[in-house]
Amino acid sequence: MIQAFLVALGGAIGSVLRYYVGQWALRLMGPAFPWGTLAVNVVGCFVIGVFAELIARRFNASMELRLLLITGFLGGFTTFSAFSLDAISLFERGEAVAGGIYIAASVGLSMAAVISGLAVMRALA
């Protein structure tokens, strides 16, 4: 039961933070492109690289901490399902180039962010 609570707690915090990042991006960049979703996915991928290195390898942290931070917090913060909907919406609006750029940027930058997060933490070892 405590494990489910930790996932829920982390998810709640991550979801609220995702909401605020989305609102910030909307105010800053406008509604024409899903900047908020792109930002949380890239940042979330970097953070999961950092957490994976710290929690799993460096500190051999408890399963509870992994559930709170990775499954809960990052599960609530990152938004792959929202990414998919945003991409389809761009295509449905006839913005195929923007849709393609969005998909390529999301996948490419997210993969680069995970690699960067791992590399940063490994360099600090």
UniProtKB/Swiss-Prot annotation:
Catalytic activity line of the entry = fluoride(in) = fluoride(out)
Instruction: Tell me which GO cellular component terms the UniProt record holds.
Output: plasma membrane
Q: What are the protein's GO molecular function terms?
A: fluoride channel activity; metal ion binding
Report the Pfam families cross-referenced here. CRCB (PF02537)
Topological type in the membrane: Multi-pass membrane protein
The record's subcellular locations are: Cell inner membrane
List keywords of the entry alphabetically: Cell inner membrane, Cell membrane, Ion channel, Ion transport, Membrane, Metal-binding, Sodium, Transmembrane, Transmembrane helix, Transport
Can you tell which superkingdom this protein's organism belongs to?
Answer: Bacteria
Instruction: Summarize where Na(+) binds, as residue positions.
Output: G75, T78
- Similarity comment: family membership: Belongs to the fluoride channel Fluc/FEX (TC 1.A.43) family.
Using the record, list the residue span of the signal peptide; answer none if the entry has no such feature.
none
Question: GO annotations under biological process?
Answer: cellular detoxification of fluoride
Per the entry, what this protein does is: Fluoride-specific ion channel. Important for reducing fluoride concentration in the cell, thus reducing its toxicity.
* Protein's recorded name: Fluoride-specific ion channel FluC
Where is the chain membrane-spanning?
A: 1-21, 32-52, 68-88, 101-121
For this protein, the activity regulation entry reads: Na(+) is not transported, but it plays an essential structural role and its presence is essential for fluoride channel function.
Q: Give the matching NCBIfam families.
A: crcB, PRK14195.1
